[in-house]
Amino acid sequence: MHVIDASVWVASFVESDVYHRASMEWLAGQVDRGATVVSPILALPEIAGAVARRTSQKSLGIRATEMVLRLPNIRLVPLDLRLSRLAADIASRLRVRGADAVYVGLAKALNIPLLTWDREQMERARPEIDVITPDVVP
């Protein structure tokens, strides 16, 4: 089980993304194995906005979120007060963006690795959690 950052989801939906193939293959492998993938509910608007922005097609952003919601092995975690406080602490201590801190906080709370392509998030979160990229994980 892994927490999946929006960068991985977005790369899987944007064919021109340099990480598209690795992201697609990793996610497909998780679905095939029936492995649970976890993201905060915040991932949905992040995915929709980034996909629509990068493709200049708003319908693709919505379609991407619908595809995520249809995955049989997805667990979307609400952003409650406990996770928000943890993310606020992480954002302050590690100097990461608020949304990035939510993913890091969720991985920390669940004691599972974070899967991301975001280099800054990766470097700053490593003292707190295991952070990996799809190209180094089965």
Regions flagged by a language model, labelled:
Residues 47, 55, 70:
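His/Asp/Glu-enriched, well-ordered alpha-helical/loop segment
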Residues 1, 44, 76-77, 104-138:
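Acidic, PIN/NYN-like endoribonuclease modules and their adjacent C-terminal/linker elements
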Residues 4, 38-39, 78, 98, ...:
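Short beta-strand scaffold positions
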Residues 1-39, 54-66, 137-138:
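Short, well-structured N-terminal submotif of metal-dependent ribonuclease cores
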Residues 32-34, 71, 110, 128:
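Structured helix-beta-strand junction loops
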Residues 15, 41, 62-93:
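Acidic catalytic patch
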Residues 35, 96, 112:
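Short glycine/serine/threonine/alanine-rich loop segments
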